[in-house]
Amino acid sequence: MRNQLVNASLKKTIYASNMINKDQNQNTNQQNMRHPNMNNPNVNNPNMNYPNVNNPNMNNQNMNNSNMNNPNVNNPNVNNPNVNNPNVNNPNVNNPNVNNPNVNNPNVNNPNMNNPNVNNPNVNNPNMNNPNMNNPNMNNPNVNYPNMNIPNMNYPNMNNPNVNYPNMNNPNMNYPNMNFQQYPYIIPPPQQQMAMFFNDWRTVLAPLKGCRIKQQFDDREFLADYVMGMKFDFNNKYLILDAGNELLKFTAIENSEFFSRNCLPKMCIPINMKILSYGKELVKPDIMVEKDCSFTICCLNRPIIKMYDFSNNNNKKLIGTIRPPFSCCSFKFDLFDASNKKIIYMDDTCCQMSILCPCPFGPFKFSNYYLRDAKTHERIAHLRKEVPFLKFVKRDIDNYTLNFEDVQNPEWKMMLLAFSLFLDYIYYDAK
């Protein structure tokens, strides 16, 4: 009975001791959560694997201890996960970067951790010193124009204000003879302008099927006639156009003396007329039509009109001649080549309605002249005279249409052009 009381008292004492130790272990665990082994007296204790080293009952392993089979009952580190951890003092024991020298480096996951500019907001910018960090080429205003030192990269002729009009400084680019015409004409395609580069009137005339001849209105004659009441005759000017597309091909300019034109009969006065292809200067004509002063009476001393080629450095070369034989009631003309051989002639009556009563309407508007081959006597060309509405303002202004029909030789075509001009000058150019 006594032994039972002693054992009961001893059990109470052991129970109280265990409870105290349990409270101490709980406090230790709370401290170890912040500093796992900071206050652990056993961390450097070689007897740390002997949990009951300070237990006075260590020699009595079976002294009625209810936890006698629990080796950790008195172990203050029983809940310490680091009790057997050799790195218990290493704060990085659970740190996967324990061997990483940059464990405390906030940029440990930063691919630029070795970059001395890791704290530089421009670390990823190769132009970190460039204030235009978002635009690597921001200092280059020509980033979209790599050749901006050539400011006209996209427009090679940008500095040339005439980029769309390479010859814009030449106001007559589209109309080479603009100074000699009254109305602008559409510029032909390059294939039709090849003659301008060769500057050869033969090349211009060869493909033509016909020409339109328009006499230009001279306001000086109009003012002299209707304002001053004086009949003065000034030099004539003609435009020679392609009959198919109305494109200007030649310009004919008369250069006669004022006294001769106004004082001598038409058959007697000297004639000097220049025919120029477009783009040529007046001092470098293609064809020169000349007639000397002559004293012509009926069939005596009939005039001779000579045509010269001036295209070869202004060297005169005779192309042919035109002679008007005497006739009472008809228009007669003979055309001769350079060898003085008759090639074409015209013999038409002068009794046409448009000749007797010229008016710009009805059957009085047109006059027809037919040119024939000197050998076959077949018709090879047709000249039609047209009376324009300007006839009411200037009575001696006329237009002509010349169809070459069977004529292929460019020299013959030029002779027919000169003949048409001479016909208008002799018979229809009134003083």
Swiss-Prot record:
Q: Does the keyword ATP-binding apply?
A: no
* Gene name for this UniProt entry: PLSCR
Protein's organism: Plasmodium berghei (strain Anka)
Q: Spell out where the chain crosses the membrane.
A: 412-428
Supply the alphabetized keyword list: Calcium, Cell membrane, Lipid transport, Magnesium, Membrane, Metal-binding, Transmembrane, Transmembrane helix, Transport
For this chain, the family text in UniProt reads: Belongs to the phospholipid scramblase family.
For region Disordered, the annotated ranges are: 20-139
Which ranges form a coiled coil?
A: none
Q: Which GO terms describe its cellular component?
A: plasma membrane
**What protein name applies here?**
Phospholipid scramblase
A single GO BP: adhesion of symbiont to host cell
* Location in or out of the cell: Cell membrane
GO MF, one annotated term? phospholipid scramblase activity
Kindly list the cofactors needed. Answer: Ca(2+); Mg(2+)
